[in-house]
Amino acid sequence: MHKIAAAPPPSATPGGGLETPLAAPKYGTLIPNRIFVGGISGDTTEADLTRVFSAYGTVKSTKIIVDRAGVSKGYGFVTFETEQEAQRLQADGECVVLRDRKLNIAPAIKKQPNPLQSIVATNGAVYYTTTPPAPISNIPMDQFAAAVYPPAAGVPAIYPPSAMQYQPFYQYYSVPMNVPTIWPQNYQENHSPLLHSPTSNPHSPHSQSHPQSPCWSIEDLRDTLPRV
């Protein structure tokens, strides 16, 4: 089998009809019997890949990767019947052109998932979980606080929700107080001079003074007793 002559680099091709193909991933798990094909044009179909690569062996399946809208991402995979056919294409297919595009042939590698992607938000902000200090009072504190670190300027950051509002706690204290003595009303009327004001209305039935009972001394009582 004759090798296909190597084409000049895309930048040196007259007219600029060819474009730089996409590169295959560098790290991951090697998939046997399968090759990576980059640099596929948007109008290329899986049937076109089957027709081109059938010259290198028995093509078992072809797959062009598309996005959610169904638009081709520019690369795909071709699976052969045996591993020898896939390796022979990688050795002989130095320049495979399809629809005026040079295809990039490389081993098919399954990329390893990145554990850091699980903490990256859609806007590029990275979330970290921090532990608050130990509480110093009886008021409960938040268990976790979210800190947002934007990667660059101009990227909108997501702020955590407002902290929970706690009602203040008041403790009851019993303070002893000196309560003044309250005397009966009759005692105040008879002995308190403040109740008999000289400016009171004399015609008022409540302001008239009550007749006082006469006061007798011991000498007066002696005069009234019969002498023996």
UniProtKB/Swiss-Prot annotation:
Residues 151-178 form the DAZ domain. One of its GO terms (molecular function) is mRNA binding. SUPFAM superfamilies: RNA-binding domain, RBD. Signal peptide: none annotated. Coiled coil: none annotated. The keyword tRNA processing does not apply. One of its GO terms (biological process) is 3'-UTR-mediated mRNA stabilization. GO terms for cellular component: cytoplasm; nucleus; perikaryon. Residues 219-228 have a biased composition (Basic and acidic residues). Testis specific. It comes from the Eukaryota. The keyword Signal does not apply. It is found in: Nucleus; Cytoplasm. Residues 33-110 form the RRM domain. RNA-binding protein that plays a central role in spermatogenesis. Required for meiotic entry and germline differentiation, at the transition between G2 and M phases of meiosis I. Acts by regulating translation of specific mRNAs, possibly by binding to their 3'-UTR. Essential for translation of twine (twe) mRNA. Required for the expression of various genes such as CG6784, CG17210, CG15841 scpr-B, scpr-C, and rho-6. PANTHER family: BOULE-RELATED, PROTEIN BOULE. Interacts with the translational regulator orb2. This is Protein boule. It comes from Drosophila melanogaster (Fruit fly). The lineage of its organism: Eukaryota, Metazoa, Ecdysozoa, Arthropoda, Hexapoda.
